[in-house]
Amino acid sequence: MVKYDAIILGSGVLGLSIASELILKGLKVAVVGKDLPEDLDSTGFASPWAGASWRSVAVNEAERRRDHYTFEQFARLAKEVPHLCEKRAYYYFWTCEDAWKEPWYKDLVFGYRMLKPEEVHAPFKYGVTYEAYTLNTPLYLLHLASTLRSAHVPIIRARLSSLDEAYSLPQLGPVDLVINATGLGARSLLGVEDPTVFPAKGQTVLVRAPVKECYGLVDPLPQPSQKAYIIPRPGPDGHVILGGCYLPNDWSTNVDPQVAEEILKQCHTLCPRLDGKGGKGTWKDIEVIAHNTGLRPVREAGLRCELEERVIGGKVRAGLATKGGKVGSGRKVSVVHAYGIGPAGYQASLGIAKELGELVDACVKKSSDNKAKL
């Protein structure tokens, strides 16, 4: 049996990106998930349902660093696989003069500038444009998985109830290092059980339209949970994602028809050409392909990206849960947590993978040093 250096729990964009980073470091890894990259219709994980565009919402230096690195890697990806990642024009419109706050990334993206009055259509008064990247998320997930499998990385379907199980899976053998990229699963996975993890429901409409640019509404909508944005997917199909909403602590994956109608109306106002009639039709003329919902994996304090040392096996005092795994005596192991990214999974994914790789380097070095002392 192959001896693996690490097991990655979770096969969403973070888990697959982390696996890709670790094999570049020469580690033998395997990916384990309840849902697999091919499960593109599953609401069990958020990754297949994203837009996804690169528009950073970073609020601190660590988040900016991750987003910046991912942006640079998307530039490479756009050259290598343009049907997955493509540089597009972005346009944002608003009516209240002070609504737009100059973003930290204005010198990172391409051609950032305020729009001239004649470039802004009614009912809006102001606008900004720049160029950044968009992804075809379902195809990107499949691309990551295919690349990993070509590198002999197994991606296995398994449902685990506890973190401890991952260190001794029958299909993979014992490991001393697990990467926890379980997303919402971190709330219920025994040994993690993070009560600050919660879902934020999103709803979008997949349409076919002759639109190549991204659009966003800056002004708040009557419902604070609702946003208006347009994200064309790279590729020849003419697919465009219209959104959306952000509903914290909503576990429902049902489509709300009223939300869907509001999305279509607001997005048609943003870009009338969505109607396929050169802007002369109405929102009802938009060619709808599918209505989608997904649950974003949010954590109150933001992303958890840290190394934790644990002890598994041995005797555990009666009545105590496995959370933390530090009670009793047994085998010393490590876990690196990478969950709680919320709506920023794609635009931060490669930066998070790089940061996590550095944590794994430190963990492996410490383990080697300890063995050398024995």
UniProtKB/Swiss-Prot annotation:
Residues the entry annotates as binding anthranilate 1: 229, 296
Cofactors required: FAD
Consequences of knocking out this gene: Decreases growth on D-asparate and D-glutamate nitrogen sources. Decreases growth in presence of D-glutamate. Triple knockout of DAO1, DAO2 and DAO3 decreases growth on D-tryptophan, D-tyrosine and D-asparagine nitrogen sources and decreases virulence in a mouse intrapharyngeal aspiration model and an intravenous injection model of infection.
Residues the record lists as binding anthranilate 2: 246
Top class in the EC scheme: oxidoreductase
Record's catalysed reaction(s): a D-alpha-amino acid + O2 + H2O = a 2-oxocarboxylate + H2O2 + NH4(+)
Subcellular location: Peroxisome matrix
Disulfide bonds: 214-271
Family matches, as Gene3D superfamilies: D-Amino Acid Oxidase, subunit A, domain 2 (3.30.9.10), NAD(P)-binding Rossmann-like Domain (3.40.50.720)
Keywords recorded for this protein, A-Z: Disulfide bond, FAD, Flavoprotein, Glycoprotein, Oxidoreductase, Peroxisome, Signal
Glycosylation site positions: 180
Region forming the signal peptide: 1-19
UniProt keyword annotation of Methyltransferase present: no
Main location: other
Induction text: Expression increases when grown on D-methionine as nitrogen source.
Record function comment: Catalyzes the oxidative deamination of D-amino acids with broad substrate specificity. Enables the organism to utilize D-amino acids as a source of nutrients. Enables the organism to utilize D-asparate and D-glutamate as a nitrogen source and may also contribute to utlization of D-tryptophan, D-tyrosine and D-asparagine as a nitrogen source. Protects the organism from the toxicity of D-amino acids, including from D-glutamate. May play a role in its interaction with the host.
Stated family: Belongs to the DAMOX/DASOX family.
Name of the protein in its database record: D-amino-acid oxidase 3
Organism field: Cryptococcus deuterogattii (strain R265) (Cryptococcus gattii VGII (strain R265))
Protein's gene: DAO3
